[in-house]
Amino acid sequence: MAVVGVSSVSRLLGRSRPQLGRPMSSGAHGEEGSARMWKTLTFFVALPGVAVSMLNVYLKSHHGEHERPEFIAYPHLRIRTKPFPWGDGNHTLFHNPHVNPLPTGYEDE
């Protein structure tokens, strides 16, 4: 009796659920076109993008030096209420003396 009940329930569940093929896949494009698409994107989008980025880095490296701006001691910038826990306490962690001023001005002036 229990076997009959299980088989009838499984038949009912099987009929109520239609068998759909992959609903999220694009049926018009097959898997054979997918490899061709990615190969095309690699050669015509990714590699030229890398080449343009390399050219940009090369041109920026030969651009030359920039003049740094004049130091103006604004009261709301570079506030030190307590020292940094490294070094002398006045330099930030990634301090660059040519670019980053201290509260009193640039170091190499």
Curated annotation (Swiss-Prot):
Keyword Transit peptide on entry: yes
GO molecular function: enzyme regulator activity; oxidoreductase activity
Associated pathology: Charcot-Marie-Tooth disease, recessive intermediate D: A form of Charcot-Marie-Tooth disease, a disorder of the peripheral nervous system, characterized by progressive weakness and atrophy, initially of the peroneal muscles and later of the distal muscles of the arms. Recessive intermediate forms of Charcot-Marie-Tooth disease are characterized by clinical and pathologic features intermediate between demyelinating and axonal peripheral neuropathies, and motor median nerve conduction velocities ranging from 25 to 45 m/sec.
Membrane topology classification: Single-pass membrane protein
Gene that produces this protein: COX6A1
Mitochondrial matrix side: 25-34
Pfam families, sorted: COX6A
Subunit and interaction comment: Component of the cytochrome c oxidase (complex IV, CIV), a multisubunit enzyme composed of 14 subunits. The complex is composed of a catalytic core of 3 subunits MT-CO1, MT-CO2 and MT-CO3, encoded in the mitochondrial DNA, and 11 supernumerary subunits COX4I1 (or COX4I2), COX5A, COX5B, COX6A1 (or COX6A2), COX6B1 (or COX6B2), COX6C, COX7A2 (or COX7A1), COX7B, COX7C, COX8A and NDUFA4, which are encoded in the nuclear genome.
Transmembrane segments: 35-59
GO cellular component: mitochondrial inner membrane; mitochondrial membrane; mitochondrion; respiratory chain complex IV
InterPro entries in the cross-refs: Cyt_c_oxidase_su6a, Cyt_c_oxidase_su6a_CS, Cyt_c_oxidase_su6a_sf
Membrane side Mitochondrial intermembrane: residue ranges: 60-109
Subcellular location: Mitochondrion inner membrane
PROSITE patterns the record matches: COX6A
Main localization category: mitochondrion
Protein name per its UniProtKB record: Cytochrome c oxidase subunit 6A1, mitochondrial
Interval spanned by the transit peptide: 1-24
Native organism: Homo sapiens (Human)
A single GO BP: mitochondrial electron transport, cytochrome c to oxygen
Pathway info: Energy metabolism; oxidative phosphorylation
